[in-house]
Amino acid sequence: MPSIQKAACKYTGRFFVARMSSPYNHSPITSQHRDWNHLNTLPTAGLIIVRHRSLLLAYSNNKQAWYLPGGKIDAGETAKQALLREIHEELALNLDAEQLHFYTHISAPAYGETPAVMMAQDCFRCELGDVMPQAQAEIGAVRYFTLAEFQQLDTQVAGVVQVYACLQADGLV
């Protein structure tokens, strides 16, 4: 059974589940296996790309906030399948499943959702090298943020705050 570590979010002081000890023990979210509506939980997948100690974020025109690229897991999809689809739609990137490496699972209030919904997100790391994704669909912009730059934003989405805490704990940002 995988162990769960806790980390304190320096922005709120609250504790949250930061990551599982091994991605090999991880069972990906699959929407067909859970009654998400009953639990008011939204299954999602997010992409983590770190370059020069900065995290790639995508600006959602719909929600007016910076997020991890990715999105909702549709019925019958695994988290990786959903992420590949979303990344193609949002960033014009054609990634292979082998490029995605499970990093962490986060759970946080889904920003801008009414009524309140919890987001459950499997996050996968990927290396792009010098390739810069292009914003498409509902994405208005993509850019890399250092932790200090992210902290200066007027809106800090809770899930992204958790990811930064994990990356900081691992010395990646």
Placement of each model-derived feature along the sequence:
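Acidic, metal-coordinating catalytic segment for phosphate/diphosphate chemistry
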Residues: 20-46
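Short, well-ordered beta-strand micro-motif
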Residues: 49, 123-127, 144-146
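Active-site-adjacent beta-strand/loop module that shapes the phosphate/pyrophosphate-binding cleft
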Residues: 42, 104-132
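Nudix hydrolase/Nudix homology domain
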Residues: 61-65, 137-173
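Conserved Nudix-box catalytic region and its N-terminal flanking loop in Nudix hydrolases
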Residues: 50-90, 94
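A short coil-to-beta-strand element that immediately follows conserved catalytic motifs
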Residues: 94-104
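Positively charged N-terminal leader segments that act as targeting/secretion signals
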Residues: 4-18
